[in-house]
UniProtKB/Swiss-Prot annotation:
Involved in cell division and chromosome segregation. Belongs to the WhiA family. One of its GO terms (molecular function) is DNA binding. It holds the Pfam family WhiA_N. InterPro entries: Homing_endonucl (IPR027434), Sporu_reg_WhiA_N_dom (IPR018478), Sporulation_regulator_WhiA (IPR003802), Sporulation_regulator_WhiA_C (IPR023054), WhiA_LAGLIDADG_dom (IPR039518). This is Probable cell division protein WhiA. The gene is whiA. The lineage of its organism: Bacteria, Bacillati, Bacillota, Bacilli, Bacillales.
Length: 323
């Protein structure tokens, strides 16, 4: 079962007050309900491929309204042959839809969210929970980028969902898709806050555990990459230094160097693998700091480059014996 399915399954076990149950139903029916007319009856079908969600919608309707309710199961014949669960109302439909603020007399459907219906904070949470159960999804934090979204056919309703989410400072954004619109979250912290808002505590804890482990792994990888880069930089510098010292040795000889450069040059080519700190501790003339050693090696680099460019030893400041 996917992380999104596990999250929705958890939500279907939540106990809610009658007022919050109505708000949750309103969100779900507005997004997943369909109306048809037969023999002067207004028939409403609420459809989902999730059995646990179908049972919840059936139970909420049964607890709130004293009307006959059917629960049907059909099998999809295209693509994935999943079961489709249909909660069907054949009587009292108009009154229920008006009570849920989905329908206004005489027969006008509302595409947005009734502000008075979600005035309380618990009602806002309930509406977002119903919307997520209806058409929400959240990526598995273990295997992909952080992403949570809720799909809506109508732009007006999508904007209302986004505004509702942002009343909780979630930094939600909207985007148009091929067949509708989505409100989405990309920040891991905001996704955990949303899971808390809708009541998915277990999913939240799992998400946080995975996020912490991912952040730790990323930190370790960054540290290793940084250390590897620094090591490569050190190795490349040592190779360059030794190459330059050997060039000086083969052209004018190390004897032409000033004493403080001559000693470090000899130590460097004799101890290719040691650090600058260790080189500083090897000097017979007294220990020199790492920065001091680095300064002398840079001077040797400059001398080698000037000799390579055609300057004479005297121009570089070296004294070459004529004997």
């Amino acid at each position: 079962m996917s992380f999104a399915s596990e999250t929705k399954k958890e939500l279907t076990h939540m106990d809610v007050s009658d007022s919050d149950a109505k708000v949750e139903l309103a969100a779900f029916i507005r997004m997943n309900g369909a109306i048809s007319f037969s023999n002067q009856l207004v028939i409403m079908d609420v459809q989902t491929e999730n059995a646990a969600i179908a049972r919840r919608m059936y139970q909420l309707l049964k607890d709130l309204y004293e009307v006959p309710i059917e629960l049907l199961v059909r099998r999809k014949m295209k693509l994935k042959k999943n079961n489709v669960y249909i909660v069907r109302l054949k009587s009292g439909t108009r009154g229920i839809l008006e009570d849920l603020r989905i329908l206004e007399p005489p027969m006008t459907f509302t595409k947005s969210i009734d502000r008075g219906f979600v005035k309380k904070r618990s009602a806002k949470r309930a509406y977002l929970r119903g919307a997520f159960l209806a058409s929400g999804s959240v990526n598995n934090p273990e295997t992909s980028s952080y992403h949570l979204e809720i799909f809506s056919v109508y732009e007006e309703h999508n904007e209302a969902i986004c505004a509702l989410m942002n009343q909780f400072d979630l930094n939600a954004r909207t985007l148009e898709r091929k067949n509708g619109f989505i409100t989405y979250l990309k920040e891991a912290e905001k996704i955990t806050e949303f899971l808390s808002i809708i009541g998915a505590t277990s999913a939240l804890l799992h998400f946080e555990d995975v996020r912490i482990m991912r952040d730790m792994r990323n930190s370790v990888n960054r540290l290793v990459n940084c250390e590897t880069a620094n090591l490569n930089k050190t190795i490349n510098a040592a190779v360059r230094q030794i190459d330059n010292i050997k060039y000086i040795q083969s052209t004018v000889g190390l004897e032409a160097l000033p004493e403080r450069l001559r000693e470090i040059a000899a130590l460097r080519i004799a101890n290719e693998d040691v650090t600058l700190k260790e080189l500083g501790e090897m000097l017979t003339t007294g220990q020199v700091s790492k920065s001091g050693i680095n300064h002398r090696l840079r001077k040797l680099d400059q001398i080698a480059e000037r000799l390579r460019s055609g300057e004479t030893p005297s121009q570089v400041g070296l004294k070459v014996s004529n004997s």
